[in-house]
Amino acid sequence: MITNSKMENKILDEFDEEELNKLKINSNNKESTTTTTSTTTTTTTTTSTSGEESDDEHTGSSSSTAAMELHRYKISQECPVDFEDDYDEESSSFDEEDEDSAAESNGGNGKLIPNPNDKKKKRSSKSSSKSSKSKSKSKNKETTANPVQNCQLMESGTLFSPTEFVKSSTVNPSKSPVQPIKLSSMLGLSELGTSNVLTVQNPQPISEPLKNDISSGSSSSSSSNNNNSNSNSNGNCNSDSTKSKFTSLNSWDAPPLANVLPDPSYCQDIVDSENNFIVPSVKHTILDVDNLFNNLIQNTNNNNNNDFKSSTMIGKPFSSGGDGSTSPLISGLSSSSIIPNGNGSLAEQQQQQQQSIPESEIPIDIKVLQLSGSRMFFNRELSELIYFYRILYEAYNPTYPILERVRFIAITSQNLDMYFCKRALKLRLGYISTRKTLKPEEHYINMVLNTTRNLINEIYNIYMNILAPELSNNNVFIIKYSDLTEPEKIQLRGFFLQHVFPLMTPLVVDAGHPFPNLSNLSLNIAVLLKHDEDTTRFVRIKVPQRIPRFVHIKQRSNYSIIPMEEIILANLDTLFPNTKILTKSLFRVSRHNDLKLSGEDQANDLLELIKTELHKRKFAPMVRLEVSHNMPAEILDMLKTQLALDAYDVYVINGPLGLQDLFELCKLNLPHLKFQPWVPHIPSRLVNLAKYPSEDVFSVIRKGELLVNLPYLSFNSSVQFFIESAVKDPKVLAIKIAIYRTNSNSQLIRALCEAASHKEVMVLVDLKASGDEEQNTKFARLLEQAGCHVSYGLVGLKTHAKIAMVVREEENGLREYLNISTGNYNASTSDVYADICLFSCDPDLGEDMCNLFNYLTGYSRVSSFKKLLIAPMNMRSTLIQLIDNEAKNAREGKDATINAVMNGLDDKRLVNALYQASIAGVKITLVVRGRCRILPGIKGISENIKVISILGRFLEHSRIYCFHNNGKPKAYIASADWLHRNLKRRVEVMVPVDDANNIKQLYEIINVYCNDSNAWEMLSDGRYKKRSSPIDEDSQTQFMNQTNQKHPVIWSK
């Protein structure tokens, strides 16, 4: 058995010197540490509410941190995980922290979060080399570069408290479909101690509990009695078969809930006095913004040990003494000043009188120095989850048709599924945002777990309390099997036997039949059978995924819909004749599907490597188990054991599992319950091409750049028409295009295959587009077989650029015609994604594009580009220069503005540059749909920054970046957001828009966004607030009205 000390030696090079010393001290002085921790816990819990964790980041046993490291090391060896790649914004994307910014700011010597796949190499090094590494790291720490020059924001401190964020739940506990369960440990480590026991939202089973499981009785008993009346309709087994032999999922801290009823007062906690929503809650403040500025000064010592001295500084910077004491940064602040706790408020036991410093007396250099303390970054996980909250609350909007509101429920559920599949395992391993933030790390994981469970609470409350009754009011009924008449049951039984029964495959689990492999996000039925007096068998049945989830009963006058699982559960006797069915319940599993693509640089065929990795995903670790409320505890325990899951991975749901399948309801032929259909229009400059045969799309582009705003203008009449014209034009000699995602029945792929017979066609297909890997591999094979030159891009980088080039022979020689877009070449999503694309034949852009394609296909070395900005080459540095130029103009008293539209913002260098520009006086407006880690509106730092988020019937997917440039505006469109992964781990393209009319159009688009009455405004503590009074009509409606006026011709096939 490997001891703790031996394990520490094995992973010696994974931690810096300070952390190693802490681990060794913890191992050698457990008794002393435990005593100290116990005292800390006792003190800090005075400010905590019952059942919640303490706010203090140091609460908990120190030995638990060492235990976490050992446990995490063990899991990482069993399951290598890719900690660099993430799924994309087209799939509600996520990515990780800017983990290597620390290394970049310290000349490449910064300490990164360890990748478990690198441990074998590191363990092979000699102990002497390890010692020299530690000395080198220590030296580099002492010679950290000037933080003002580096402009790097580092991750540190505990800005967000798990306890406080739990309070943001807007669910009425007495009426919520999910109820709390207490966990005694995290990550399967019993030694984590009682300080880590927390209350998380987990629902109570409805089935009748045994008498000895009921703690006190009246409320639980009455609730369970009420539940019995609905047991059969919910697929429960007969009461006589379960009452005495099977244990329900115990009565937990709250009585079970039989039915979720509409609650008129449900929304009150998320509505302020002006009746507008605030996410996560009106009553909750994530950050103590009033004290944040002074707190930044107080905590500079936690992150900066440098010799920087400003000429305008009052006093000296913090310097840490050997005893841990500090010297003041500014005169008047003593080393005994109050230290803020985890959520930015002042620890109750440390409250003292503090001398505040007027903001006007704090010089700009001090403000910039404070930024390196990194408490100005909103938490990455919370930012993503609050984005899900904003999507979810669109389902509240009473002005939306009911089926569109149901669609937002499905979108939120789908996003949450992807979150678990991409992030959950990484969180469990402890590699995301934990090493440099909350300690012990369990607190951070608990916070995210509580937030996801609260979000699930919200999803089911909105669906069951609000939307389901409203669907019924609109004659759309989602019924249960027990609601059917006998003739309808007979008819559905015939339907089942003819269309479903042949697809069913019961799989028993016994000595001769191992536990079956479960596919990701599959819905399954757990059945317990009894063949004779002594033998019981567990059988798993997968609900077929190739048949609809909902069945429409057309005999009824209204829309009556029954879930497929209800039909299967009611007809299980046809699968098990002459067998007694003891219990039947539903469960759904989620697997980690972001495994590392190992050996990419050594693979002979990337296509075959992708196929191998896709196969491995079918056996990836489980990360979540959702079960129906009526599942017996014995079955649940068996599933947890077989799937290697713990209690906090289980979600017991009092409602339908897999709400993302509600997308099927949105396809019902009920136009009066949906948005009025929008038919895209033809760009006015392309309307006359059909009337005048001498005209073609290339002659239109030669007259000037063409900017197309999708989906208001037609993708088919612009982008698709451009490619198809190139295929048919005999003067076109070559077509080159990069495809990241496209639709399954792509006309574009067919056109390229046709062109390959008589033209040079080069197609770059990114095989690593998350979620579309399998489809892209099929397209790659199809294109190769048609004669196209197919490339898979650069090793180690995704090719996310959306670019196409047509080479045409003309009188003056060859000319390149280009299309550069912010969105994919996907006709299916082009109708619902808001994107911008540019058509141009600029010679400089053409030369740049030729060089770029040669770089992508032939690894040719390109020293520079004339106009194009390419990530990871020069895009980030150019953006920082553009931001710094605005800051310089503002300091000189000139007008300076930055307007940007994007999907997400988390790159620390860009955030830091924006903070400094704000301090300089630049007016900054950011339209960020999703994750945003900048904090706007903080006096003296970001008061010139405004952040809004727009959600609506179309998904805002554009990337537009505009800079005032002293009255000579510079405008760009790009495939990249201001996310670290886009700027460092992908091939992205940003192109300048030169035409004055097009620049004006981009500014008009941004102006419409800023006046959107449906926008969410980001508050300075990270929450979002819905605008209370309409400034103007919502932006998407205004774009549709403008399109009707400027481009009156509607596209038709």
Swiss-Prot record:
<comment type="similarity">
    <text>Belongs to the polyphosphate kinase 1 (PPK1) family.</text>
</comment>
<dbReference type="Pfam" id="PF13089">
    <property type="entry name" value="PP_kinase_N"/>
</dbReference>
<keyword id="KW-0808">Transferase</keyword>
<feature type="active site" description="Phosphohistidine intermediate">
    <location>
        <position position="800"/>
    </location>
</feature>
<keyword id="KW-0597">Phosphoprotein</keyword>
<keyword id="KW-0418">Kinase</keyword>
<feature type="compositionally biased region" description="Low complexity">
    <location>
        <begin position="32"/>
        <end position="50"/>
    </location>
</feature>
<dbReference type="InterPro" id="IPR036830">
    <property type="entry name" value="PP_kinase_middle_dom_sf"/>
</dbReference>
<dbReference type="Pfam" id="PF02503">
    <property type="entry name" value="PP_kinase"/>
</dbReference>
<dbReference type="InterPro" id="IPR041108">
    <property type="entry name" value="PP_kinase_C_1"/>
</dbReference>
<dbReference type="InterPro" id="IPR025198">
    <property type="entry name" value="PPK_N_dom"/>
</dbReference>
<comment type="subunit">
    <text>Hexamer. May form higher oligomeric structures in the presence of ATP.</text>
</comment>
<dbReference type="GO" id="GO:0009847">
    <property type="term" value="P:spore germination"/>
</dbReference>
<dbReference type="GO" id="GO:0006797">
    <property type="term" value="P:polyphosphate metabolic process"/>
</dbReference>
<keyword id="KW-0749">Sporulation</keyword>
<keyword id="KW-0547">Nucleotide-binding</keyword>
<dbReference type="GO" id="GO:0006799">
    <property type="term" value="P:polyphosphate biosynthetic process"/>
</dbReference>
<feature type="region of interest" description="Disordered">
    <location>
        <begin position="23"/>
        <end position="155"/>
    </location>
</feature>
<dbReference type="GO" id="GO:0031288">
    <property type="term" value="P:sorocarp morphogenesis"/>
</dbReference>
<feature type="region of interest" description="Disordered">
    <location>
        <begin position="302"/>
        <end position="328"/>
    </location>
</feature>
<keyword id="KW-0581">Phagocytosis</keyword>
<feature type="region of interest" description="Disordered">
    <location>
        <begin position="1027"/>
        <end position="1053"/>
    </location>
</feature>
<feature type="compositionally biased region" description="Polar residues">
    <location>
        <begin position="143"/>
        <end position="155"/>
    </location>
</feature>
<dbReference type="InterPro" id="IPR025200">
    <property type="entry name" value="PPK_C_dom2"/>
</dbReference>
<comment type="function">
    <text>Catalyzes the reversible transfer of the terminal phosphate of ATP to form a long-chain polyphosphate (polyP). Produces polyP in a broad range of chain lengths (50-300 Pi residues). Involved in development (growth and fruiting body formation), sporulation, phagocytosis, cell division and the late stages of cytokinesis.</text>
</comment>
<keyword id="KW-0132">Cell division</keyword>
<dbReference type="GO" id="GO:0006909">
    <property type="term" value="P:phagocytosis"/>
</dbReference>
<dbReference type="InterPro" id="IPR003414">
    <property type="entry name" value="PP_kinase"/>
</dbReference>
<dbReference type="Pfam" id="PF13090">
    <property type="entry name" value="PP_kinase_C"/>
</dbReference>
<keyword id="KW-0067">ATP-binding</keyword>
<dbReference type="InterPro" id="IPR036832">
    <property type="entry name" value="PPK_N_dom_sf"/>
</dbReference>
<dbReference type="GO" id="GO:0009358">
    <property type="term" value="C:polyphosphate kinase complex"/>
</dbReference>
<feature type="region of interest" description="Disordered">
    <location>
        <begin position="200"/>
        <end position="245"/>
    </location>
</feature>
<dbReference type="GO" id="GO:0005524">
    <property type="term" value="F:ATP binding"/>
</dbReference>
<dbReference type="InterPro" id="IPR024953">
    <property type="entry name" value="PP_kinase_middle"/>
</dbReference>
<feature type="compositionally biased region" description="Polar residues">
    <location>
        <begin position="1036"/>
        <end position="1046"/>
    </location>
</feature>
<dbReference type="GO" id="GO:1903665">
    <property type="term" value="P:negative regulation of asexual reproduction"/>
</dbReference>
<dbReference type="GO" id="GO:0031982">
    <property type="term" value="C:vesicle"/>
</dbReference>
<dbReference type="GO" id="GO:0030435">
    <property type="term" value="P:sporulation resulting in formation of a cellular spore"/>
</dbReference>
<feature type="compositionally biased region" description="Acidic residues">
    <location>
        <begin position="81"/>
        <end position="102"/>
    </location>
</feature>
<dbReference type="GO" id="GO:0016020">
    <property type="term" value="C:membrane"/>
</dbReference>
<feature type="compositionally biased region" description="Low complexity">
    <location>
        <begin position="215"/>
        <end position="239"/>
    </location>
</feature>
